[in-house]
Amino acid sequence: MAHYLLQVGYTPETWKALVHNPQDRSEAITGAVEKLGGKVERFWMAFGEYDVVGVVDMPDNVSAAAFAMAISAGGACKNIKTTPLMSTKEGIEAMRKAATCGYTPAKAKAAGR
């Protein structure tokens, strides 16, 4: 399964509801992820730009996107960021593949030409 880093920011209304009725939202997240064929690896509360951070395993990008859409459609979050994760082994494999793809960057035109 593919790994994804999820970062979620709550709306002020969601914070108001949670402050007045504290609850563990990881249970709701876990249930939704599992219904999409995934698994929650870790889940944390945070502060700053994002209020919740988690690492989930999902069967594919479509399932990860569906989860992000479901969270967004619920209206409790002001932003959600999903980042696909790779192992270092996969990263090195990608570096080796990148070296063989033949891409060349744009070059500036020489002065006076």
Predicted regions and their residues:
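A compositional/biophysical signature of low hydrophobicity enriched in polar/charged and small residues
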Residues: 1-113
